[in-house]
């Protein structure tokens, strides 16, 4: 799923349709964008059939394969733009058996992920209400 980009493909049916049409109407679209448009067509059909993509899940996502969830799919870590297979594999290995109390703790444990990757995962909803840091406030 090289052309699968979670930022676009997991944004919902209307967002997928808009991005797909935007690329298709761009006569100067790059080969990468054209490949993404083809993937978006498949994603649009997926949504039309009543399925959905769950957010990338720091505990459940595989490195390179989609995971089946109730009525949908959980994308792999490689679906994050710019996140390569080796970083995805390392992340799955490093997170094994752990429970994280903050984004900071996850980031320190999964050290192959850049700040940009962490920010993208945050924007995609992968941390589901998890606090940014492990610090607690005694007087706040």
Language-model segments: residues:
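Noncatalytic, beta-rich nucleic-acid-contacting surfaces in large DNA/RNA-processing enzymes
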Residues: 1-140
């Amino acid at each position: 799923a090289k052309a699968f980009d979670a930022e676009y493909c997991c944004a919902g049916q209307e967002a997928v349709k808009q991005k797909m049409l935007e690329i298709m109407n761009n006569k100067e679209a790059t080969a990468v964008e054209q490949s993404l448009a083809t993937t978006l067509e498949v994603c649009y059909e997926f949504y039309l059939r009543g399925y959905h993509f769950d957010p990338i899940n720091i505990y459940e996502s595989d490195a390179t394969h989609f995971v089946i969830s109730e009525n949908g799919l959980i994308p792999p870590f490689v679906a994050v733009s710019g996140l390569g297979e080796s970083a995805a594999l390392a992340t799955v290995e490093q997170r094994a058996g752990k429970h994280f109390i903050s984004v900071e703790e996850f980031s320190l444990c999964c050290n192959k992920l850049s700040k940009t990757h962490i920010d993208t995962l945050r924007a995609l909803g992968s941390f589901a209400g998890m606090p940014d840091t492990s610090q607690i406030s005694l007087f706040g």
